[in-house]
Amino acid sequence: MDRFLEDGRIEIEGISATSAGTLNAIAYGWGAMRGGPEGAREALESLWREVSRAGALYSPVRQWSLDRSWPGAAALSGLTFGLFSAWTRVLSPYQFNPLDFNPLREMLRNCIDFEELVRCDCVDLFVSATNVRTGQVRVFRNEEITPEVVLASACLPDLFQAVEIDGEHYWDGGYMGNPSLFPLFYYTRSRDIVIVHINPIERDEIPRTAMDIENRLNEITFNASLLKELRAIAFVVKLLEEKWIRDEYREKLKHVLIHSVRADEALKDLGVATKFVSNWEFLTDLRDRGRETAGRWLAENFDCLGERSSIDVRTAYLQRGDDRPLTRTT
């Protein structure tokens, strides 16, 4: 996002986000309403600096692997996470954190004026959280966003108690919408949807260690809801292209243009343990990887915006054979 804002050629009409992406979304909205793109960039950096400060005190995992001078650093980081992960399988957050302490709660109140944010009219925000009782996704819009909504969107159930909002309890939105794409179809005018991936879609190697298996399972789980929505998009596009829909209904369907900023190569060396790391050196490394990836995407695909999809959803995400022509049955 920082690279897109620096570029200045892209106007962001809506952001659908979940989990850590929700922090980016609210920081963007808060900063943009006060100072435009540069204000948004400043707000993003300020918020993540506060996340880093909070993590220095409370993060269960340290990024030892950044110390390249010690060969065993990565192994120690994995061991630390493994011990912590085992702990969460024995005790729930209702047991080891009965007071429901979350360092993000106070940090959010210090960084963002939510009474002002709910009046943001420079971007449509869509924040996803998973309803624990129903298993359905709930999407919160600008006027509904509070610190509790942000905490719900990023609530990993192994770490934190479910967040109660309006009598319902919520976990991380990534389980059912990572992110949710449908609000962008229904509530925005733009045909272009740019998906920014933080989990690799594909990995060439078969995981064989316990840590690698857990890492890949985490990636597959959090990519599943997105892939289902992309399958639905591909189906509608196929119906439009093969003229299975009557002319009087075709105009009612938005022929969306899909773009994808994928960082499979840039992030392939980062496992699930790094999702709990928040020191500033590591966060700026992530930012720089993202900026480099976004810069390449802009150079290669900017001219596609407003004209055509820069990827073929069927070949980029779906299994081979899913793009076979539809056949009528009688």
Where do the PLM segments sit?
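C-terminal helical/tail subdomains of lipid-metabolizing enzymes
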Residues: 103, 108, 237-330
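Acidic, Ser/Thr-rich peripheral helices and adjacent loops at domain boundaries
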Residues: 207-238
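Active-site gating loop/helix substructures
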Residues: 85-191, 195-196, 202-215
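Short glycine-enriched, charge-decorated loop/helix-capping segments at active-site entrances
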Residues: 30, 210, 275-279
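Patatin-like phospholipase
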Residues: 1-102, 108, 142-152, 208, ...
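Short connector loops/turns at beta-strand edges and beta->alpha or beta->beta junctions
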Residues: 20, 155-156, 199-201, 264-268
